[in-house]
Regions:
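Catalytic-site signature segments of enzymes, centered on catalytic residues
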Residues: 101, 107-108, 173-262
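N-terminal leader/targeting segments and the immediately adjacent pre-domain N-terminus
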Residues: 16-106, 129-135, 163, 190, ...
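Structured C-terminal helix/loop/strand segments within mature extracytoplasmic catalytic/sensor domains
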Residues: 34-36, 324-384
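Active-site Gly/Thr loop motif
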Residues: 248, 292-341
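Active-site helix/loop module of the DD-peptidase/beta-lactamase fold
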Residues: 131-169, 201, 228-266
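Active-site-proximal alpha-helical segments within enzyme catalytic domains
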Residues: 216-223, 262-283, 328-345
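Active-site SXXK
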Residues: 94, 111-137, 161, 220-224, ...
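Sec-dependent bacterial lipoprotein signal peptides
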Residues: 1-13
Length: 384
């Protein structure tokens, strides 16, 4: 009975004695736990890895290892007046942790890729190689393009197209020695494959005369259509989109040529599925949709600070980013299981079936003060 006696005594003392009329004090609540340099408690990993199904899962920033203290500054930066941002989404560990839309926009509204589409073309090339539709990156392209037969151009390889080392003029409609504009004039050509083929060598094959050429990518896309027997959007849907529950619409020119270098329309959430696929090394919920070896090769130049295989480097981060005109962004930082996206307000002109026929086309605008690296840095600064 000694233990009971001690406990009873302690209880009475703690209550101010057996018959005391002293008022009880209301206990002060313990402060909510916080994390260093954050006003709330941030959960530390490891984090469960989930996959979106038809719908996405959302989670708080702090539950996924990110501090929400400065999240409003991230949103304010993206949507600063004059930036004409339509949507931003941040995905961590498979959860959407930030999602904001411009006034009047919802998760169901389309965004457009512009040159973010190049990274989709790169992914499909990896699939085509895995399936044996393309035997090697070192295949010469003359077998696909009879227009080049009997000329030195027939020795250009698929790898040359993928790394922008064809030696051809960059712009199919501009001056032959203009290597600075990325060949943007091809967008205004009715038959864009013919335009891309109608370029002459300006230097040795394998020499990097420029860092960017829409025409080179257009031809890489054409090779995938020839070898697969499908339009790019059909091949994309069969190999990636339908499996990931994503709907991608790839634009064509007036001659029915898919624009491999640009112009995919999808919701921002569906673009996020593509980013997550690369954050997870080409795996989607147990299926290896893109060979891991291709993920490693196609992002290797970007991880070493050079544009190649249609991915850009991210300054200061061990990741890679797909970039499109007017600040379209899908940034992937695999070590943080992080996807960061920004899309501009998008108007789809005409009936959306082709580009530059009648009133059909794209409409986005140049943001006044949006910088891709600054935006990425603001998001990654939330990680604890």
């Amino acid at each position: 009975m000694r233990l009971l006696s001690i406990l009873t005594t302690v209880f009475l003392v703690g209550c101010g004695g057996g018959g005391s009329s002293a008022p009880e004090e209301t206990p002060t609540p313990a402060p909510a736990p916080t994390t260093q340099n954050c006003n709330v408690f941030v959960t530390k990993g490891p984090y469960p890895q989930i996959w979106p199904t038809v719908e996405w899962n959302t989670a708080s920033l702090e539950s996924q290892g990110m501090c929400p203290d400065e999240v409003q500054s991230v949103i304010d930066y993206a949507f600063l007046e004059g930036n004409d941002t339509g949507a931003i989404i941040v995905i961590r560990n498979g959860y959407i942790v930030i999602e904001e839309y411009d006034s009047g926009k919802t998760e169901n509204d389309l965004a457009t890729s512009w040159s973010v589409g190049k990274s989709f073309a790169s992914a499909l090339m990896g699939v085509a190689l895995e399936e044996g539709l393309v035997s090697s990156l070192d295949e010469t392209t003359g077998q696909y393009f009879p227009e080049w037969a009997g000329t030195e151009r027939e020795n250009i390889t698929i790898r040359n197209l993928m790394t922008l080392r064809t030696g051809l003029q960059a712009d199919c409609l501009g001056p032959p020695n203009d290597f600075d504009n990325g060949g943007n004039s091809i967008y205004f050509s009715l038959d864009q494959v013919a335009c891309a083929l109608n370029r002459e060598l300006q230097g040795p094959i394998g020499e990097k005369l420029y860092s960017y050429s829409n025409s080179d990518v257009m031809l890489a896309g054409e090779i995938m259509e020839i070898t697969s027997g499908m339009k790019l959007d059909e091949y994309l849907d069969q190999k990636l989109g339908s499996i990931m529950n994503a709907d991608y619409q790839w634009w064509e020119d007036a001659f029915g040529n898919s624009l491999g270098y640009c112009c995919i329309d999808a919701t921002p959430r569906d673009f996020g599925r593509f980013g997550l696929l690369f954050a997870r090394n080409g795996e989607w919920d147990g299926q290896q949709l893109i060979p891991q070896s291709w993920i490693e090769l196609s992002t290797s130049l970007a991880l070493n600070g050079e544009y190649g295989y249609y991915w850009w480097p991210i300054n200061g981060h061990d990741g890679f980013v797909a970039i499109g005109l007017h600040g379209q962004t899908i940034a992937v930082i695999p070590e943080d299981n992080l996807v960061i996206m920004r899309f501009g307000n998008y108007s789809r002109l005409g009936d959306g079936s082709t580009v530059r026929v009648g009133t059909n086309g794209h409409s986005t605008s140049q943001p006044l003060s949006y910088d891709i690296t600054s935006f990425i840095n603001r998001v990654t600064a939330l990680i604890r």
